[in-house]
Regions:
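A cross-family "folded-core" feature that marks the main globular domain of proteins
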Residues: 2-150
């Protein structure tokens, strides 16, 4: 895989073996690397294949600390397994971005109201139960305590 752009020390945008743009994460993956160089495959922790606009998706991922990205993805995948659903990369990126922003809001002392929570609980009780379990797991592993309604 050839690097197209280094976003930070842990995130690179690449062209993979079959010509698709992909986003790779891993500790030190982009450290002292440049566009045109090959990727050290031993450093790859995750690979995301965006449906479209790989550049903007890569920037979202690059803006999230690697430890937080890994934690949120692990907790989300566990919840998806319990629910018995597949997890496309685009969904993972959306959830990771949402949870990261929620953590930043909490850190800044901002509180959000979720007026559709009761409706979501009624229409999707199992998904809501798993989301609440995700919040509990994230709270146990992070310094930021997300509100139950998140």
């Amino acid at each position: 895989m050839v690097i197209l752009r280094v976003l930070n020390n842990n995130v690179v945008l690449v062209r993979d073996e079959i010509g698709r743009e992909a986003i790779l994460t891993g500790r030190g993956l982009g450290f002292q690397r440049r566009a045109g160089q090959d990727v050290d495959a031993s450093l790859i922790a995750r690979r995301y294949i965006p449906v479209d606009n790989a550049e903007s998706v890569a920037e979202v991922i690059a803006g999230i600390p690697l430890e937080r990205l890994t934690l949120i993805e692990r907790v989300f995948r566990r919840a998806a397994r319990e629910l018995g659903t597949g997890v496309p990369s685009s969904t993972i990126v959306a959830v990771v971005d949402h949870v990261n922003q929620a953590m930043e809001r909490v850190r800044q002392g901002l509180v959000m109201d979720y007026p559709l929570r009761a409706e979501a609980a009624h229409l999707h009780p199992e998904e809501l139960r798993l989301a609440e379990a995700m919040v509990e797991q994230l709270n146990a592993a992070q310094e930021v305590q997300l509100p139950a309604g998140e």
